[in-house]
């Protein structure tokens, strides 16, 4: 932070004021969680209701799933009223039994068994790393359709400098992850803050002047970004070494359940929703196959921003109605 504001003491003061305001902001009670209809290894399949074919949303392992169900900006609750029964895979907290599960292992041991409890294959929608994982689940377990939202696949599409920075962070954290069995959330925060340090400074500078609903929305979003469980050691190793460093998915070498996972092998329609201004998951890292919707919103703003319903929710619902009708 100081390196970004060293030449501007007034800016530093605004940023610090924004941080203080965020820390002292009142928090509303979170909405009640949707009921769990199946559980496995600490993860739960949650039912948000709605009539029609099942659509299962798969969030990232890295942050809580609440970004998909954030107050009056809830994609899940909105879609439940539009001809779909909406389900969420809530990863929960990784207990010791999950410390040895790779990213692909979470697909094999958790996603596929939970999907098997449904009466028929669902539509799948995956956000961020959840989209990468949903692609494996769609190929191995079957799906009516697959929509990915800001999901990385071609990890060589991340700038070289960022991949090198993440490799260095993993090297510095690997011993701790091996000893604890998990990579703490704090280490993950450092990794992803480093992808866009200027934004981290700018958002608190701007928050210093926000009031009312805008300020409350900022607090809710930041609480989500700063919350979440650790990630198991094996999943962290695969994420940093096999994905960011070696790009096994993008080079056609990522195996889950002994099978190569490849977009060309998907048994269903595919939609990739990407943002051309996403600094966390650049659009150049997305799959190239399937249909594509491009937005000019941030990694999170595309899902919950003021234009999200118009630019993402409605186009997603329309696509589902076309390729996977009720």
Outline where the language-model segments fall.
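Alpha/beta-hydrolase-fold enzymes
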Residues: 1, 119, 133-231
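Short, surface-exposed "cap/lid" segments of acyl-processing enzymes
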Residues: 30-95
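Alpha/beta-hydrolase active-site loop
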Residues: 100-117
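Short beta-strand immediately N-terminal to the catalytic nucleophile in serine-hydrolase-like folds
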Residues: 124-126, 149, 273
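Gly/Ala-rich beta-loop-alpha elbow adjacent to hydrolase catalytic centers
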Residues: 125-134
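Short beta-strand/loop motif that positions the catalytic acidic residue
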Residues: 266, 272-274, 278
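Conserved loop-alpha-helix segment in the C-terminal half of the alpha/beta-hydrolase fold
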Residues: 276-293
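Catalytic histidine-centered segment of alpha/beta-hydrolase-like enzymes
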Residues: 280-283, 297-311
């Amino acid at each position: 932070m100081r390196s970004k504001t060293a030449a501007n003491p007034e800016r530093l003061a605004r940023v610090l004021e924004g941080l203080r305001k965020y820390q002292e902001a009142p928090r509303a009670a979170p909405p009640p969680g949707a009921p769990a209809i199946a559980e496995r290894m600490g993860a739960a399949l949650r039912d948000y209701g709605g009539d029609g074919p099942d659509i299962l949303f798969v969030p990232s392992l890295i942050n809580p799933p609440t970004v998909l169900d954030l107050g009056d900006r809830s994609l899940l609750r909105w879609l439940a009223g539009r001809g779909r029964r909406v389900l969420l895979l809530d990863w929960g907290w990784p207990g010791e039994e999950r410390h040895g599960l790779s990213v692909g292992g979470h697909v094999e041991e958790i996603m596929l068994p939970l999907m098997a409890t449904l009466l028929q294959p669902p539509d799948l929608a995956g956000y961020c790393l959840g989209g990468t994982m949903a692609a494996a689940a769609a190929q191995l377990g079957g799906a009516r359709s697959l929509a990915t939202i800001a999901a990385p696949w071609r990890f060589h599409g991340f700038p070289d400098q960022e991949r090198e920075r993440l490799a260095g962070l993993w090297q510095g954290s690997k011993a701790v992850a091996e000893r604890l069995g998990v990579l703490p959330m704090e280490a993950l925060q450092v990794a992803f803050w480093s992808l866009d340090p200027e934004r981290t400074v700018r958002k608190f500078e701007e928050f210093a002047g926000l009031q009312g609903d805008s300020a409350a929305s900022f607090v809710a979003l930041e609480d989500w970004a700063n919350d979440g469980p650790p990630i198991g050691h094996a999943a962290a190793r695969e994420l940093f070494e096999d994905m960011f460093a070696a790009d096994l998915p993008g080079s056609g070498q990522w195996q889950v359940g002994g099978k190569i996972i490849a977009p060309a092998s998907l048994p269903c329609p595919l939609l990739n929703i990407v943002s051309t201004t996403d600094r966390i998951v650049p659009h150049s890292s997305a799959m190239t196959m399937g249909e594509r919707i491009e937005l000019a919103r941030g990694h999170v703003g595309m899902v919950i921003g003021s234009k999200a319903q118009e630019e993402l929710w409605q186009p997603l619902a329309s696509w589902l109605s076309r390729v996977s009708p009720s």
